[in-house]
Regions:
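N-terminal helical cap/lid subdomain that shapes the substrate entry/recognition surface
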Residues: 1-96
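Glycine-centered loop/turn motif at secondary-structure junctions
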Residues: 24, 69, 108-109, 182
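A general structural signal for well-ordered secondary-structure junctions
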Residues: 91, 108-111
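Asp-based, Mg2+/Mn2+-dependent phosphohydrolase catalytic module
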Residues: 6-7, 99, 103, 110-220
């Protein structure tokens, strides 16, 4: 929602794979369906992988270089590969207007991050605007399930779900998850997607430049 995650993840993945292949030779990575199948296989072996995506990433690397021996060498390569990936994963470019909007809103509201990912917002200059950040690892679950939202209540005093606003770009993980709990929502729709859910479409915006004005008009 704050930056375009897709090119960031893609570049991190490609750079990490190239580094691994420089170390061990060509690796059969497979396509996205192969990734999903391997993910399901790993979850059957360790249910926590469903919400611990850092562990998921490491275990995928480990599976892909399972032919490397001894095991301690394989583990070293996996750990170093993950460090490369996670560092690259934090090389982001914020959407226009994000920092200005957060600076304005943080002076009037308590702001928090709820993410299914493993980016650490406090590594970015915008981290100073957020009172809390909850990942899937900390929630031990993933949106649209309610664990993230329940945990958010621990960081705010005397606030209930009907006094919250959740802003997100994913129709299910962000909007449906909040809607089911009676949390107000705003949909960040910068790609002009069609609304495809069977519950009412929330207010939407496509530019962070106008978000403060939308919130002021909505609540003040």
């Amino acid at each position: 929602t704050l930056w375009d995650n897709r090119p960031t993840i893609l570049k991190a993945e490609i750079d990490t794979r190239n580094w691994i292949e420089d170390k061990v030779g060509e690796v059969q990575w497979g396509d996205f369906n192969d990734f999903l199948s391997l993910r399901e296989e790993l979850i059957k072996e360790d249910a926590s992988i469903e919400w611990d995506i850092s562990k998921l990433r490491k275990e995928i690397f480990r599976k892909k270089i399972s032919h490397i021996t001894p095991s301690n060498l394989r583990d070293e390569i996996v750990d170093e590969a993950f460090n490369i990936f996670i560092n690259k994963r934090h090389e982001i470019e914020l959407f226009d207007g994000v920092e200005e909007a957060l600076n304005f809103l943080s002076k009037k509201y308590v702001l928090g991050i709820l993410t299914n990912g493993n980016a650490n917002v406090y590594k970015f200059k915008i981290g100073k605007y957020f009172k809390f950040a909850i990942s899937s690892l900390e929630a031990r679950d993933s949106k649209p399930n309610r664990a993230h939202f329940d945990k958010a209540l621990e960081f705010v005093d005397d606030i209930s779900f009907d006094q919250m606003l959740h802003i997100g770009d994913h129709q299910v993980n962000d909007i449906l998850g909040a809607y089911n709990l009676g949390i107000d929502t705003l949909w960040f729709n910068n790609n002009n997607e069609k609304w495809s859910q069977d519950f009412p479409k929330p207010d939407e915006f496509k530019s962070w430049d106008i978000l403060p004005r939308i919130i002021e008009n909505k609540y003040e």
